[in-house]
Design a protein with these regions (language model features):
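Interfacial segments of alpha-helical transmembrane regions
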Residues: 1-12, 62-82, 148-149
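N-terminal cysteine/histidine-rich coordination modules
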Residues: 7-8, 17-29, 39, 57-58
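C-terminal TM-helix exit segments that contain a strictly Trp-centered aromatic cap at the helix terminus
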Residues: 16-25, 79-95
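Alpha-helical transmembrane segments of multipass membrane proteins
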Residues: 19-23, 51, 127, 152
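Loop-to-helix transition at the N-terminal end of transmembrane alpha-helices
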Residues: 30-45
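Structural signal for the C-terminal ends of transmembrane alpha-helices
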Residues: 51-61, 152-159
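Extracytosolic (periplasmic/ER-lumenal) interhelical loops and adjacent juxtamembrane/interface segments
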Residues: 93-137
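A hydrophobic membrane-anchoring alpha-helix module
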Residues: 120-160
Length: 160
């Protein structure tokens, strides 16, 4: 497969993942935790690098020789999101601790002053949605790491 197709597919993948996450959030009512937001940024960047890069190449602003670099950048960004998803899935399964900002102890009321600091925090160590025992973070890990590996393999194979 050509580098230009891989670049476009990587950008489209990033965009699709963001749209899917937003769909789960706004249509499905699955609120994201802090680590969920961490996973979104690399997908946004992959969409910008992949699709934006192709737009700049097609407009003649960027030379075509940079297409493989754009593809690699987008694939690395997708892999980063997948790695964060794998980390979050591990936190959900209690394999290792997550960040204190979203896995700390539940709120304990000890007086009226505590109510001024209450926030609706979505915990990172509890999956809000699962399908076949796998959370959204787990699916992001599986799909994104798999897509990045396939894209990288196709780029390497395309050079020979």
């Amino acid at each position: 497969m050509s580098a230009i197709r891989i670049t476009g597919l990587a950008g489209a993948y990033g965009l699709a993942m963001i749209l899917g996450a937003l769909g789960f959030q706004y249509l499905g009512g699955v609120l994201p935790c802090e680590m969920c937001h961490w996973q979104r940024w690399p997908h946004i960047a992959a969409a910008v690098v992949g699709l934006g890069g192709l737009l700049l190449v097609s407009a003649g602003i960027v030379d075509r020789k940079y297409i493989p670099a754009l593809a690699w950048c987008a694939l690395i960004l997708i892999a980063i999101s997948g790695a964060i998803g794998a980390y979050q899935a591990g936190v959900e399964w209690k394999f290792f601790p997550g960040p204190a900002s979203c896995t700390g102890p539940r709120f304990v009321f000890s007086g009226m002053a505590d109510l001024s600091h209450v926030h609706n925090v979505v915990r990172c160590d509890e999956a809000s949605w699962r399908l076949f025992g796998i959370s959204l973070a787990g699916y992001n890990a599986l799909c994104s790491l798999g897509a990045a590996a396939l894209g990288g393999f196709a780029l390497i194979r395309g050079k020979s």
